């Protein structure tokens, strides 16, 4: 039971508080929540600008380029879904710091275009928010840090527990998995993951 409900039930709220206080407090609470959400999205957008610059430099120079001096990761790929105009830069590794600023290339999975299952993970409310709009049959382009681009076709989705994905990164197939938390609209962390599976079409010249 929250404090607003308990006060109202005892009559303290309605009898001793001015009528404008409740709407005012609700408005303040809303601004705080909106501000927190706005900060998260603003950080995500700013990070992608810096990551895009670092990724462009990485392709041009062939050297790992950090997006900012204190970063412990660097951009390794760009994921694009042209039909829905979605694009995001991927960072090396899936640590908490990496995922705070962009999708992460999950450790011990191959690069896009290589044999096996390349896995990229990101938060559902920022960088992989667009996954809810990806349809079966959509083409997904992944550009690596060496400048090579590979095209995949989305062919299925699944809901799995985080510790029981069933993904075999050493598969003989050429596949891509984009992973995020499930359900999309949840406000608290949970054990389930949404997986978008895609099969390699081939390199893009």
Which residues fall in each region the model found?
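Hydrophobic beta-strand core residues of beta-sandwich domains
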Residues: 5-6, 134
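Solvent-exposed, non-transmembrane regions of membrane-associated and secreted proteins
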Residues: 20-205
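A cross-taxon signal for low-complexity, glycine/charged-rich
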Residues: 1, 7-13
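Generic low-polarity alpha-helical segments
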Residues: 6-7, 164
